């Protein structure tokens, strides 16, 4: 897991305020055969019967139709389809006699302006950074309003440096690299998804002095290794990329500009440059198809 290739990340992000919609619903969970906490013997039996009746109303085909509709278009936070989905879910819940409120928040949500990844030595390679459509799944060809593969709340930036493979990018991995005399300081760390939450990877890499992070799904973990890839199974094909936030949630979750309070229209907000949960180095997720030429170009011990 040593290094010797070079890689270039050009990655910038634009942030804007958007409207996020949320539906909340609390449903009681099944208890044991004993008296439920907060219920006497009679009311426990009534509660269990209500839950049994509720379960009997669940229709698998109906749920499949809802899921297909909700996921038929890109529906990231603040998108038209996200709002449409929230309103549709709210109406369904109201039809079942639930009291539903859609709460509106103005949160910071970054989108990438440009994404580039190039290997410049010992040979040249330009990553595609795209996911191939799946012929049997029409939704994968619908690119209207579709955001490209990226990690939200990565800082923007452009770096060129040597590439170091850091396995899963966990503390144990960095301890092993240190024993081999390998440092990521001033370099780009490339790690596999897994082993820890993805937001920990750029956080640790930055603390170790790295100037950028690449993250890919290794096929041994999420690909042909454990089973069939999509659409024949649940695992990623060679162009699949895991998206998701890399904000420093252990510091605080939620909107990066309004720690500890709801992101309503009149609340005080941090400046973006002062938000501690935005990464300190650029992060870019890639497929294992794009990762392979980078890994093949590397030298050193394995």
Task: Cite the ranges covered by each PLM segment.
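Sec/Tat signal peptide C-region and signal peptidase I cleavage site
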Residues: 29-33
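Noncatalytic luminal/extracellular "stalk/propeptide" segments of secretory-pathway proteins
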Residues: 36-49, 56, 68-185, 219, ...
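Soluble metallo-hydrolase cores and metallopeptidase-like ectodomains found primarily
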Residues: 136, 141-176, 252-302
